[in-house]
């Protein structure tokens, strides 16, 4: 036996955090017998808020900065981390979490919406570091290898999910800017030597201002800069509202306001103001005085209506009703509750919303809960064409058939906050007309843009080492799976041109003999891959960070019905491994149902898959043969779970997340008892397999009896640990059997 190995299991938010209360005790009971310790690390939104304000808390309330600790751990060669989805907090989510913590006696400060004093600005800065996708860039010290495991793919082929039919007369389409956006204004430079660059804004009077402290760059680093014109954006949005009305389709906006936490809420706010233009033309000043900020969505305006006097409020509500009557129908997030696509920025996330629409015959829901053709507005044109190509393909060829279609695994460049997903601290809403320049340490101007007040300017970085690692990973996956690999890069786009120079150089250093590796612009790559997909052929997509995110939702949702069933491996650059559980989010709607009905429909398949590859990685790194046996038997148990249809169902009274955990435990114990590679494990798990087999009906009945009534877990963002554990482990018989292991 080797000395005790450690796996870190992240404690996150919402549905996956609830599932952890049930699954983790099972995992810890099993791994103990293989000399593996599974520890938790709290990177939940509430945990990160508490860690940011130790001086506001009592000694007993303080928590370590688990995210910073984990950020260091992933750089160690023996790192082994299971990473569950966490909230990428929008401002409404952040403020709700703060309120909940304050109500529980944690004296964290309020979020300053409009900071005036230095102290308020300092508090706001700390909170802004927690906002948006604050976790993944810290932990992703490697590139991404995402694919559908064979067991999952085979199950989907035998048990196809529903796919909405497409007709040739579908009016659904993507609307994107033809000029003035990030794509059309991009400039790119590769710096030959290590340097630092300043980002300097000069106004029309010649006054200079550094927009942030200088950015350190490594040798060979690619930097890009670009700007979204506010004028061009507003013109585009107004045209699209008009066009949606003329075409009789729903108006919908698809952004990523969580990850792109600086740029996208601003764009979202402009869309709200354009759609509800008469409201802002007539009442803009009064709404601003009431604290309305529609960068947080139209819901923010509605939430602040009670701050207006009765007459003004009535007039605003009448104007809103008039806008709804005059404008195209908005796509709805929740028709029953009247929540539109423009209510909350974090409700409609492009990488999830577009595939869901495509799977649903290209339709979204209107105010009456009916599916309608839709105008999908994606203002920046960098990647919008990929979705248009997919829509065109479905319109021409009909919906995909999950029983015969191939698969599109992804190798994604994401290490060290590559590309747009690392741009937040270099993104600025411009205050006045002028010019922004990027100037190196020697005083050379590397890039410059003329800008106007309200424009959004940003800079991105892509380091050389991650690119080299990404190309190597792509070649490895192409060889191991004997599958063509396509780099989705556009040689006419400045950033992609810079990247291609590196890709070609690194490919030349590798053995690519007998491999089919090609480079296609994103729209062409989409058409090529979709054609193969329909014919049952597989194609690896090798992409940058944003397309990694988009495609690992798009293809899995079409192939498997969900992106939560993906194997998501991050081979860390220093030799460790991070195993992400699926590619979906943290499923707030699942929690809503759980609180109302005590039924959790979250599917932990992503966790099962990640655990198996985590054990396998540990076995390879440490020579722990028991870990390999755990991996093999867990894979077999997972396949059995799928074949026996023991995944969670949607309705209360049916099997839920807790029931699926029981069946996984039963099958895993049976597999361990049946195997002959490790006598100790066989002996340890035979009694458990026997007990669970005998008590199956009793345990399922106990789990089922808990459902159908409201669940109390003592909080949403910061549930009470004891209450949550009790709610998620309601079978005394099952708990006793595990305790004896």
Language model region names:
Residues 700-717:
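A glycine-biased, small/acidic residue-tolerant capping/turn segment at secondary-structure junctions
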